[in-house]
Design a protein with these regions (language model features):
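Loop/helix-junction capping segments adjacent to catalytic residues or to phosphate/diphosphate-binding pockets
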Residues: 14, 38-39, 69
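Local sequence-structure signature of Cys/Sec-based thiol-disulfide redox active-site neighborhoods
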Residues: 1-31
């Protein structure tokens, strides 16, 4: 199952989501939005906005499902943990 996380390096909830995935040995791709600059950053922010309608973090994509923010119980449910 594909897992992707849009995160900010300064976001405590992003760190919690990533720590949860790491502790449960879940493979995932991470996009650190604040690691981009200029047009690249604008493009990534627009990608997040198109997914969520806003710019809240983290955005966790698990298969076809999306979680905005850190929601441990929902992540457990979607990952069958």
């Amino acid at each position: 199952m594909m897992v992707k996380v849009y995160a900010l390096t300064t976001c405590p909830y992003c760190r919690m989501a990533r720590r949860f995935l790491d502790e449960n040995s879940v493979a995932y791709d991470v996009i650190e939005v604040d690691g981009f600059e200029g047009d690249e950053k604008k493009a990534v922010v627009e990608e997040v906005r198109s997914l969520t309608g806003g710019t809240s973090f983290p955005v966790v994509l698990i298969g076809d499902e999306m979680i905005v923010g850190f929601n441990k119980s929902r992540m457990q449910e979607l990952l069958n943990l």
